[in-house]
């Protein structure tokens, strides 16, 4: 095999064995040797994705000559793809994660074994299939009559009709599939007939070959005496070829042993045989060249005596002569230790017959299988499968979750666990679920870990495995393994007694499951089968009921849909449930003898039961007889309660049929409210409050749960609101109690609590911490209020005293001793406590008066300063406005003078310059002599020259207009007239003389005039054609049929002057008409008058 490089740093190269094989082929073939096939570089070994289940390699093909088609053998099984070729890169969800080795030995298959809905596998042989090259959509209707479309192959659905594909009705699909099935059956019959014919032809060919072999043997017997010398050389060549073939066989056997795991089945030792086919026509010498083939043959045993074997056969070229010798002589047989492995890699392409597409195993999704929403891909029945990829059969059972080992568990469990996987004692003791991590080793022995669910690989041991190892170390069970061989995986029904101790303790919870929950558990779907040719599927539930499901419209029906009525295949599908068939297969495959796993489970369960019995005996030593009797009585009570509950449920079911659902739901909600069912609890915890109420049976189990969920949603908010209001009301009552107590703000909480501990309002606050917080808050508010009241009272006394002093009109020179005598009888004076405070307030009042006087003076000075500043600012603004106004007047005056100078200079030019042929330099000398020249002194030299040029251009334009007016008035001028002809007519006219003295300039102006007139005439003629309604898009066809239509058009146009102007150029006029007609024909019919986009016209 070619060595695979890393990231592309090394080129592709062949090993010596491949080069030697290519050289041998070049020597043995007469024509040019086939080139060695370039080995395609695949991904690195650890990055290579696992092959899909349908591409698993099987037994290698039988030996045959290279590059030649083998004879047909009807007993030969279908050939798999040639070995050595890496599987194709699959989609991302089928690719192996980094550092994950390919599946070998007993490793679990990768998750890619289950095809996703987006990539349906091929159909089984013989099943009617749609045309592979044609995309077909089927039109169907929903129960309410709405039309939708779905792809018959990919199951994709849409409300709108797809474009560019074939669309058929639902009623047309079934006949088409039936016709295809008939065609396939005919093709299979023809293929079988051809196979029989080929087998007969092969038998005849073998008989002929035997006859030829006998004739050759006789000829060889006659010629062997003459070829003894050549026989010695032949023996030497055979010995060399044999040694070389043995070396190649050993190299390839070693490569196979390294690249594939060794199966556990035994096989006879392979052999290396050398056969020498000879062929000699008459008595002449002929050389027969054969190819050396090294192949591993695996024969399928047809009887009990036949066993698979592998052999390495080497054929060498020989030169045969006449001699009495057998046809084929076995030279040597060398036994080799050769394990049964996958077929070796083929370094060159070998044509092989196409392998038949096998039916998909039970794990894969058959055609038209679309999983139900929220349900995983269902495994049929017990979900067992046989992987027949080598000469041995391996039975793989599923885990408790209903999936194969190594596969990701389903998102929503759909199938009840019906099989048990062989587990270690540690798993039986502590683990309640299969671990997601698996341990693997690389080629160099390094350990890594792979997660079957997340497809993640890591070098470090996960925490889950570490905890599992710790649990294994704690558990020490005296269980010895009877054999070192791996235990086969069994399919056993689950037994609660075989579960670990932890699960045994949880059994009472399982016994508490009500009849409604058990019925709901049984009503879950367990299997599904699609109906060919329709979007419907048949679904079986755990209670043996059948309903129909449409994954396209997400519609489920208990009754059979209209398009499935009267179909025999649907009746057959319903009569043969796949899960029951899987149970029967499981019973057939199940081994009757007890295994090591069953013995271990029995020992563990017996030891656990024994421990529990000992514990119960120790606890109930005093009353063993009473306990047993009580247990019997309890069992009887439980049975009687169950019977009574079943009778009540049956009676309630009859009553439910009478009372409307809304009334029953309302009564059920009232019961929940009356019984005080908490909105923050679960259905199981609150069930004991309502289960004995007669209204409990008004609804079935499903409706009870739904109403309870609605009640919880609405009642939760109400309870929160009530709880909040209750807490707020308790706080308000507590505050009122503190206000009524009128305690000293300096009191402590302990004193307050001791005094009011028996008050109901005190007890309404549950936590002492909350009571203390409310008390501290109230005390802080009281203290703050007291402080604010004291401050306010002091401010009022002060303001009243100041008012008293202000009434006596005091000034800064007043004395307290004199003022005191005047105000001491006033109550506002007496309100101040001490005389020192009164004197201090008096001094504050005098200082305030003095400050007020000073502040008034300062305010007056500031007011005067502001007035003066505003006057100065106003004066500056007036001066600025005056200066701007003066400047504007000066600018206007200058502009007026400048305009006056321009007018004077233009008047000067009008009087002095009459000819347009003069220059500025000559005219300037003449203008200087005029007195008006000085009036234009304000103009610059460039401005005067610019005005002169404008004056000259005006004169030239005026003369040109007069000249063209002269040409227009000359009726003899046509579009084809020349200057020589026109010159004779207009040369005496003053306008022609004044235009220019240069005849060349006149001719140039005349030619420009004719050109402009010609362009204008053509434009006017096109406008005339558009205005002529007689010319339409049909005119071209009419003109092609007869020239009369064109003559009619010209006759109509002759009445217009725009047509007559072009009389001098009739050919050009005819071209314009034809071009317009072609344009109308190209545009086609005109759009209707209401069209909003006239540009969208149909073009031919």
From Swiss-Prot:
Residues 1-90, 258-332, 461-528, 616-642, 872-897, 1078-1100 are annotated as: Disordered. Residues 661-714, 727-781, 793-848, 898-954, 956-1012, 1014-1079 form the FF domain. CDD domains: WW. A motif (Nuclear localization signal) lies at residues 628-632. GO terms for molecular function: DNA-binding transcription factor activity; proline-rich region binding; RNA polymerase binding. Transcription factor that binds RNA polymerase II and inhibits the elongation of transcripts from target promoters. Regulates transcription elongation in a TATA box-dependent manner. This is Transcription elongation regulator 1. It comes from Mus musculus (Mouse). The gene is Tcerg1.
């Amino acid at each position: 095999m070619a060595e695979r490089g890393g990231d592309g740093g090394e080129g592709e190269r062949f090993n010596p064995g491949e080069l030697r094989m290519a050289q041998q082929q070049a020597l043995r073939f007469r024509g040019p040797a086939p080139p060695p096939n370039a080995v395609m570089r695949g991904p690195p070994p650890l990055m290579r994705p696992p092959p899909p289940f349908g591409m698993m390699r099987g037994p290698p093909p039988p030996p045959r000559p290279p590059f030649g088609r083998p004879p047909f053998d009807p007993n030969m099984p279908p050939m798999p793809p040639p070995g050595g070729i890496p599987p194709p890169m699959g989609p991302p969800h089928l690719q192996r994660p980094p550092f994950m080795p390919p599946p070998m030995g007993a490793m679990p298959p990768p998750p890619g074994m289950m095809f996703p809905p987006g990539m349906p596998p091929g159909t089984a042989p013989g099943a009617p299939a749609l045309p592979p090259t044609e995309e077909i959509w089927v039109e169907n209707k929903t129960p309410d009559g709405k039309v939708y479309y779905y792809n018959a192959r990919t199951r994709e659905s849409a409300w709108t009709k797809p474009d560019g594909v074939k669309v058929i009705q639902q009623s047309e699909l079934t006949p088409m599939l039936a016709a295809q099935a008939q065609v396939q059956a005919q093709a299979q019959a023809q293929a079988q007939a051809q196979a029989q014919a080929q087998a007969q032809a092969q038998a005849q060919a073998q008989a002929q070959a035997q006859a030829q072999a006998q004739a050759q043997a006789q000829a060889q017997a006659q010629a062997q005496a003459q070829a003894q010398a050549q026989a010695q050389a032949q023996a030497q060549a055979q010995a060399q070829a044999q040694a070389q073939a043995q070396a190649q066989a050993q190299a390839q056997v070693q490569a196979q042993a390294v690249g594939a795991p060794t199966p556990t089945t035994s096989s006879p030792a392979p052999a290396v045989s050398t056969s020498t086919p000879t062929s000699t026509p008459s008595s002449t010498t002929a050389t027969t060249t054969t190819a050396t083939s090294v192949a591993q043959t695996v024969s399928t045993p047809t009887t009990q005596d036949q066993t698979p074997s592998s052999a390495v056969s080497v054929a060498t070229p020989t030169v045969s002569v006449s001699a009495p010798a057998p046809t084929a002589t076995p030279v040597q047989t060398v036994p080799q230790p050769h394990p049964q492995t996958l077929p070796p890699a083929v370094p060159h392409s070998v044509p092989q017959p196409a392998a038949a597409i096998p039916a998909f195993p039970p794990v894969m999704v058959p055609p038209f299988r679309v999983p139900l929403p929220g349900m995983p891909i269902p495994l049929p029945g017990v979900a067992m499968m046989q992987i027949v990829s080598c000469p041995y059969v391996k039975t793989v059972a599923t885990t408790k979750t209903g999936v194969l080992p190594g596969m990701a568990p389903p998102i929503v469990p759909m199938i009840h666990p019906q099989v048990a996987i062989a587990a270690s004692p540690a798993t039986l003791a502590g683990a309640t679920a299969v671990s997601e991590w698996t341990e693997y080793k690389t080629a160099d022995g390094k350990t890594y870990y792979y997660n079957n669910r997340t497809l993640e690989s890591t070098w470090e041991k996960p925490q889950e495995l570490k905890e599992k190892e710790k649990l294994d170390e704690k558990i020490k069970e005296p269980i010895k393994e009877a054999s070192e061989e791996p235990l086969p995986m069994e399919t056993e029904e689950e037994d609660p007694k075989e579960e670990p101790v932890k699960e045994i303790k949880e059994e009472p919870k399982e016994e508490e499951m009500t009849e409604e929950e058990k019925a709901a558990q049984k009503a879950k779907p367990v299997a599904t089968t699609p109906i060919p040719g329709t979007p419907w599927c048949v679904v079986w539930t755990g209670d043996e009921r059948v309903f129909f499901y449409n994954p396209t419209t997400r519609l489920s029906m208990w009754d059979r849909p209209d398009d499935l009525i009267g179909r025999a295949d649907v009746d057959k599908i319903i009569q043969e449930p796949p899960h029951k068939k899987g149970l029967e297969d499981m019973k057939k495959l199940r081994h009757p003898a007890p295994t090591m796993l069953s013995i271990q489970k029995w020992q563990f369960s017996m030891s656990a039961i024994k421990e529990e019995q000992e514990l119960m005996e120790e606890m109930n030593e005093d009353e063993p007889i009473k306990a047993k009797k009580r247990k019997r009585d309890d069992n009887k009570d439980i049975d009687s309660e169950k019977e009574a509950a079943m009778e009540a449920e049956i009676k309630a079911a009859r009553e439910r049929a009478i009372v409307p659902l809304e009334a029953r739901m309302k009564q059920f909600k009232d019961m929940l409210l009356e019984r005080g069912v908490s909105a923050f609890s679960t259905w199981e915890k609150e069930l004991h409050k309502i289960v004995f109420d007669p209204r409990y049976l008004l609804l079935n189990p499903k409706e009870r749960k739904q109403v309870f969920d609605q009640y919880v949603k609405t009642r939760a908010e109400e309870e929160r609101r009530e709880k909040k209001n209750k807490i707020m009301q308790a706080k308000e009552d507590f505050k009122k109690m503190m206000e009524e107590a009128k305690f000293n703000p300096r009191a402590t909480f302990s004193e307050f609590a001791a005094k009011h501990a028996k008050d109901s309002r005190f007890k309404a606050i549950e936590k002492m911490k909350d009571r203390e917080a409310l008390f501290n808050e109230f005390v802080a508010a009281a203290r703050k209020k007291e402080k604010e009241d004291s401050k306010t009272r002091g401010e009022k006394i002060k303001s009243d005293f100041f008012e008293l002093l202000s009434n006596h009109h005091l000034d800064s020179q007043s004395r307290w001793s004199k003022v005191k005598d005047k105000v001491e009888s006033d109550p506002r004076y007496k309100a101040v406590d001490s005389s020192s405070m009164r004197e201090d307030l008096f001094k504050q009042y005098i200082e305030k008066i003095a400050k007020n006087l000073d502040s008034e003076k300062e305010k007056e000075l500031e007011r005067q300063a502001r007035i003066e500043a505003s006057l100065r600012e106003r004066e500056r603004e007036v001066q600025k406005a005056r200066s701007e106004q003066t400047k504007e007047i000066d600018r206007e005056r200058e502009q007026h003078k400048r305009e006056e100078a321009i007018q004077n200079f233009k008047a000067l030019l009008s009087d002095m310059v009459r000819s347009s042929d003069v220059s500025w330099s000559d005219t300037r000398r003449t203008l200087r002599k005029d007195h008006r020249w000085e009036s234009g002194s304000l103009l610059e030299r460039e401005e005067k020259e610019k005005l002169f040029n404008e004056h000259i251009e005006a004169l030239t334009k005026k003369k040109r207009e007069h000249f063209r007016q002269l040409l227009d008035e000359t009726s003899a001028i046509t579009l084809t007239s020349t200057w020589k002809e026109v010159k004779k007519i207009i040369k005496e006219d003053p306008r022609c003389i004044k235009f220019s003295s240069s005849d060349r300039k006149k001719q140039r102006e005349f030619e420009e005039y004719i050109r402009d007139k010609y362009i204008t005439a053509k434009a006017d003629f096109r406008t005339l054609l558009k205005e002529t309604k007689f010319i339409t898009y049909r005119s071209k066809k009419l003109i092609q049929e007869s020239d009369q239509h064109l003559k009619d058009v010209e006759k109509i146009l002759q009445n217009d002057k725009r047509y007559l102007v072009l009389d001098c150029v009739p050919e050009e006029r005819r071209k314009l008409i034809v071009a317009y007609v072609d344009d109308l024909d190209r545009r086609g019919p005109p759009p209707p008058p209401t069209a909003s986009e006239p540009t969208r016209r149909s073009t031919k």
